Amino acid sequence: MWLKPEEVLLKNALKLWVTEKSNDYFVLQRRRGYGEDSGGLTGLLVGTLDTVLDSTAKVAPFRILHQTPDSQVYWTIACGASLEEISQHWDWLQQNIVRTLSVFDSGEDITSFVQGKIRGLIAEEGTSAGDEEDPERFREAVLRFERLFGLPQREKLVTYFSCSYWRGRVPNQGWIYLSTNFLCFYSYMLGNEVKLVYPWDEVSRLERTSSVLLAESIRVRVRGEDHFFSMLLRLQQTYLIMQQLADYAIVRFFDKETFHAEHPLANPLHITQRALEIHARNQSFRSFFRLPQEENLCEVYESFLWVPFSHVNTLGKICVSENYLCFASQDGSQCHLIIPLWEVFSVELPDRSSRALTVCLRGKRALRFSEVRDFERLAATIRRKCGTLGSPQHCITNPDEEGVMVGQSQAVSTEALMNVFHPHDAENLDPKMLKERMKEQSWQIHFAEYGRGTGMFCTKKTRDLIVRGVPETLRGELWMLFSGAVHDMISHPGYYGRLLEDCMGSSSLACDEIERDLHRSLPEHPAFQSDTGISALRRVLTAYAHRNPKIGYCQAMNILTSVLLLYAKEEEAFWLLVAVCERMLPDYFNRRIIGALVDQAVFEELIREHLTQLTEHMTDLSFFSSVSLSWFLTLFISVLPIESAVNVVDCFFYDGIKAILQLGLAVLDYNMDNLLCCNDDAEAVTVLNRFFDSVTNKDSPLPATVQQASATANDKSIQKVDISDLIKEAYEKYGDIRTEEVENMRKRNKLYVIQTLEDTTKQNVLRVVAQDVKFSASQLDELYLLFKNHDPSLPYLDQYQLDQSQFSSLFNLLQPWTTHTHSRSLARSAFHLLDENGDGLVNFKEFICGLDILYNRSFTEKLKLLFKLHLQPDSAEDGVIRKCPERGRAKVDLQEYLKQWQEDLQRREENIKDLPRINQVQFISLTKTLYSVFHGDEEEESLYRAVARVTSLLLRMEEVGRKLQDSSPQKTPQTTPTSTSQPESSPTKPTSPESETPAESRSTHDQPESPVSQHETAPSHSDITPNSTSHPSTPTSSPTETSSPVLDTPTDTPSSPCTVRDGDWSFSFEQILASLLNEPSVVRFFERVVNTDTLITRARKNQLKDAH
């Protein structure tokens, strides 16, 4: 590899390098301790020094230096891992550079020319290290990474750090390498080499820890084993990168269906340290300000913002994206605001001395920022973006335009269902209504002071108002604002209407499920007892299923959406659902509910941290995880009365999942005494259900007909709990839980949850497969990992399946015989044979059952498998393999199912007499396969002779049979000789590889189908030898002769695949088996015990090399 020229004093390197070649301008050197003297003490010391100092010489012990006769300074220009590699660079220099250097007069000119040439060569290589901070050093690290770990060429190194890896109480100083798919570590200390390579998708725990021995370290759990890395200079940065890489690996490998192709990091080759940092920053920015997924953080400025309601300047950061100007305080005031750039009217620079700028908004509002370091650049950025976003398409400011939009969607409900079924009565002087008006007045005062809409200041006072309860009339507006759904709706005008038009009249599984659950959504509420509410709910759910078919429709979405429709317009409810499913509760609403399971694990962790008394009493907290599932999926709507649940939803839209976790802790804390008295889970469930029935909302203005009456509503002995008090207590006791902390816990537990699900799936699969094979449990476990890694992109809960190319690769890695010329065709035939349902995929059970025959079964079973591999498949004249009709995926009735089940049982008890006969082309292919399998064996010569004897014997037997048949009296067509007859049914779908002898196959198939010829000649022994290129003799026939009745057999009969022409010869499996049993060498070969563990170990080593 060419290197950027760097100075080196040769006199300081004489003790570590040995000169191999030299001329007037260049020196080729070898590192001491490598090559001839690598085994001595010098090799140990130099190797240790190279590892500790991160020297390139560890993996590139050869180098080329540039020198000039009049200078003592040398320049490194190339390095190599082997003498052959460095010699190529040396030869290139000799042929292209040395002759040219003689024309220069001074040494400086020579050095300048050489350096320029080397830099040009490096630029031509175009390596991916150009984006890194130190390209040359990163190029060297990439070289070490590739040489040390032998991973696929497409594997991309992201970053690397110096650290110590702890084995027991002994630290091993080395380097950790983080690539797109692997965590690697290498250390070499005084001859003790430590090398670790772990895929990210096998990491189940990743967290920062500290102990007495280790001040601070990173703990990585892989396959149940903990690994500790410490003494990292930038531990937090390293941990965040490792966390991101593990998360992306989980998403790519186990959740590919939700990993969008347009994702910025969908291509692993685009993942760099800088890309990871940018992506993490964008995610954090969007999550904090609840902005659409299209927004990316462009610029950040520190500044002071004048806050009019408190009359102070608050310190914070200005964040600018494509369409928004955001500010978040850093002084603990919890103040933040979001300004859409299309709302900006102008930008002024009133005071350059204080580096201030004023942003004027529509509606006669202004924001004054001061002490902005680069205020002129910020002003120019805002002006430029406002110029491109000045179009009114982003918001509706014209009342006429609004009327047009409403008129275009007459079918869409433009009123919240609560306003339709329970309109606000201004003359109602009920105490609850009076309190509701007081709440409205408090919010109006807040709006007047802090602003209203997207430009509102959000502060501690805003949260206080949320905790006390949101007025019914403002609930929809505030949900849209705090969830960020308002930004999505403004950015996509008319999107919901177009979705409804696109999905109108469509039918799908999601639509069927939606129809089934429509009448189960708040059935006690009048809005969903009429067509108005049911139709609106159907439209919103159907539109979302059409927008996001990867999620489609999941249970609990109907309950949540019905509550949204009560307080928001139909289009607003749609965008609220989008915000919940895609941003606020990611991975919740799919068939695996991974997001809910992750939050269950987070909840369990918080219980251990905050409710220690409960954890001491109940060591197994899985009960609370299972009970809380409905809490998270429905935001407590399914367990609380609707009038109380909406207060919880208020807090959720403001604080996210943090509010739900806090409330869950408060519920358990409130019932602590009763839970400690429970003896089993059933009692605990009863305690919690009774508590939820006692929760009320004394301030709710909803009429009694709407409120859900609990079973204990009239029970005076049960103490009532007001939802506002419960929420207030949750914020007071557990409000210190930060959103950032919850997100980190989510990431940490996501690895554990997915690996737990994967392990459960694996155990279930292995339990089923183990009943039919003779592999040990550990061997099955290793084979499962090999099988899984050949298709890591499938969702983890799906049964792993391989297509033909993947199967062939894995089959060739695991077959017990040495690689031979027929490996590819044999693997192809095995794939079609094992694909019992004809779907073009082989699952783990099918694969293991086939492998079990090759590894653990008797000589007869192995030979039978080889025999079946060489039978012709069910194929049409075009050569396309087609599935048998009975193996289709169509629905069948009970009788048909029982018939198929009986046939499967019969297939398991398959008798060798039921196997079809093998014709001449297939037999020749089988013989050649045997020759290839025997190649390289210690008894190769005797095995070859045995096959030749068996072939000759079978041919003589067939010839004698033909002669006896010819000399017998003429028979009717119904008594055609048995050589062309087939059994009535074939229990196994026969398959065959492509012919390895195209000339033979072509000449055979080109013949016209003919009856038995009286002049047929049997092939000679030379026709079947492994080196033979000729094909067996075939009969000649007259076109006027009539065909045999065998050829008139319908093509859909089971015997048709192996029907042969009457002029060809064929053998039964019994004949071949009987002949080979007389050859001890062949029997010994197939009865030889297979070292399964060795083959699996070899396959694991070679799998990565063949992965790409």
UniProtKB/Swiss-Prot annotation:
Residues 961-1059 are annotated as: Disordered. Keywords: Calcium, Cytoplasm, GTPase activation, Metal-binding, Repeat. Ca(2+) binds at residues 835, 837, 839, 846. InterPro entries: EF-hand-dom_pair (IPR011992), EF_Hand_1_Ca_BS (IPR018247), EF_hand_dom (IPR002048), GRAM (IPR004182), PH-like_dom_sf (IPR011993), Rab-GAP-TBC_dom (IPR000195), Rab-GAP_TBC_sf (IPR035969), TBC1D8B_PH-GRAM1 (IPR036012). This is TBC1 domain family member 8B. Involved in vesicular recycling, probably as a GTPase-activating protein for Rab family protein(s). The record marks 555 as: Glutamine finger. Residues 469-656 form the Rab-GAP TBC domain. The arginine and glutamine fingers are critical for the GTPase-activating mechanism, they pull out Rab's 'switch 2' glutamine and insert in Rab's active site. It is found in: Cytoplasm, Cytosol. The keyword Cytoplasm applies. Residues 143-210, 283-351 form the GRAM domain. CDD domains: PH-GRAM1_TBC1D8B (cd13350), PH-GRAM2_TBC1D8B (cd13352). GO terms for biological process: glomerular filtration; vesicle-mediated transport. SUPFAM superfamilies: EF-hand, Ypt/Rab-GAP domain of gyp1p. Residues 967-998, 1025-1057 have a biased composition (Low complexity). SMART domains: GRAM, TBC. It comes from the Eukaryota. Residues 1010-1024 have a biased composition (Polar residues). The keyword Electron transport does not apply. Pfam families: GRAM, RabGAP-TBC. The record marks 516 as: Arginine finger. GO terms for cellular component: cytosol. One of its GO terms (molecular function) is GTPase activator activity.
